[in-house]
Swiss-Prot record:
Subunit structure: Interacts with ULT1.
Portion annotated as DNA-binding: 245-270
A GO molecular-function descriptor: transcription cis-regulatory region binding
Keywords: Cytoplasm, DNA-binding, Flowering, Nucleus, Transcription, Transcription regulation
Biased composition (Basic and acidic residues): 341-363
Organism in which the protein naturally occurs: Arabidopsis thaliana (Mouse-ear cress)
Domain spans labelled HTH myb-type: 214-274
Record note on disruption phenotype: Increased number of sepals and petals in flowers. Loss of organ boundary and identity, producing fused sepals, petaloid stamens and branching stamens fused along the filament.
Tissues of expression: Expressed in roots, inflorescence apex, floral primordia, stamen primordia, carpel primordia and ovules.
GO biological process: floral organ formation; negative regulation of gene expression; regulation of DNA-templated transcription; specification of plant organ identity
Taxonomic lineage from the root: Eukaryota, Viridiplantae, Streptophyta, Embryophyta, Tracheophyta
A Gene Ontology cellular-component term: cytosol
Superkingdom of this protein's organism: Eukaryota
Protein name from the UniProt record: Transcription factor HHO5
Length: 363
């Protein structure tokens, strides 16, 4: 075919030999496998991958209409990229081996003549002790064989090795025997245990009461002299409404006397004044009648038998004829109230314990 001048000017080439027909992937891989040089293999595969990527970019616009074409192109590109990576790894390994060989050759060439002398001396030593060298080499080989052999052998008279028997796992423990007791029977047993503990608590209760009685007996009993000192301190301080337990105790100067004892004695003294007020015409100061303190202490001496320090006294006048009797009644009433309060507290404690036991049974 003859080209015209216009074709030559426009740079048109009508030679069809330049354009080669596309090859299938299997044929391309067969041709690449025949190439011995890794560098040329990589260049061929890179060129083929570039053509596939160009094709994919062209049909990317029509990927919805041509989904299978896109899938095939992507698979071929991924496969060829994996092949390129494998070839590059082989090339790196070859280069590292070549470099190591070159260094070894350089070291061998640079060895001085002194190495030969040391080699000769070591050779003489080796000749002098040949048995020890053989023994050491044999021991090393045996150790290697033992370490490489994953199975352990047993030594028998015939020098034959057999596998070690597998250890059987221990048998599981037998199941616990089933109890024939019903839940109701278990609850009854728990209830009986609770009752036993409750009876035990009741038996121990009198001991606590006796301990409480002993405490009452150990408390202070107020004598006539102690009453006199108490009333004298009240008169000095200005009466029971003004005086404080600490001030009274400091003025009394009695060994072993505490503020609590003086406080309880003062409270009962004030209570007695409220219950039995004296007529103003009959009231006299303690300075007018010197025997007032003696009569006051005698009339209130019976009140010293209560739980806390007591024996209330009138500070500013005389008592009537029934003062001692009324003070004894007050003492009895207070003792009864304390006993009732102790009994109520113990009953409440028992009730709360019973309620807790019932709740535990229900849970």
């Amino acid at each position: 075919m003859v080209q015209t001048e216009t074709d030559q000017r426009m740079g048109l080439n009508l030679n069809l030999s330049i354009y080669s027909l596309p090859k299938p992937l299997s044929q391309f891989l067969d041709e690449v496998s025949r190439i011995k040089d890794n560098h040329s293999k990589l260049s061929e595969i890179d060129g083929y991958v570039g053509k596939l990527e160009e094709e994919r970019n062209k049909i990317d616009v029509f990927k919805r209409e041509l989904p299978l074409c896109m899938l095939l192109l992507n698979e071929e590109i991924v496969f060829l990229c994996v092949a390129i990576g494998a070839l590059k790894d082989e090339a790196r390994k070859g280069l590292s081996l070549m470099a190591s060989n070159g260094k070894f050759d350089d070291v061998e060439r640079a060895k001085p003549e002194t190495d030969k002398k040391s080699w000769m001396s070591s050779a003489q030593l080796w000749i002098s002790n040949p048995n020890s060298q053989f023994r050491s080499t044999n021991e090393e080989e045996e150790d290697r064989c033992v370490s490489q052999n994953p199975f352990q052998t047993c030594n028998y008279p015939n020098q034959g090795g057999v596998f070690m028997p597998f250890n059987r796992p221990p048998p599981p423990p037998p199941p616990a025997p089933l109890s024939l007791m019903t839940p109701t029977s278990e609850m009854m047993m728990d209830y009986s245990r609770i009752e036993q503990s409750h009876h035990h608590h009741q038996f121990n209760k009198p001991s606590s009461q006796s301990h409480h009685i002993q405490k009452k007996e150990q408390r202070r009993r107020w004598s006539q002299e102690l009453h006199r000192k108490f009333v004298d301190a009240l008169h000095r301080l200005g009466g029971p409404q003004v005086a404080t337990p600490k001030q009274i105790r400091d003025l009394m100067k009695v060994d072993g006397l505490t503020n609590d004892e003086v406080k309880s004695h003062l409270q009962k003294y004030r209570m007695h004044i409220r219950k039995h007020p004296l007529h103003p015409t009959k009231t006299l100061s303690s300075s007018d009648q010197p025997g007032v303190l003696e009569r006051e202490s005698q009339s209130l001496i019976s009140l010293s038998r209560s739980d806390s320090p007591q024996s209330p006294l009138v500070a500013r006048g005389l008592f009537s004829s029934n003062v001692g009797h009324s003070s004894e009644e007050d003492e009895e009433e207070e003792d009864e109230e304390e006993e009732k309060s102790d009994g109520r507290s113990s009953c409440r404690n028992d009730e709360t314990k019973k309620k807790r036991q019932v709740l535990d049974l229900e849970l």
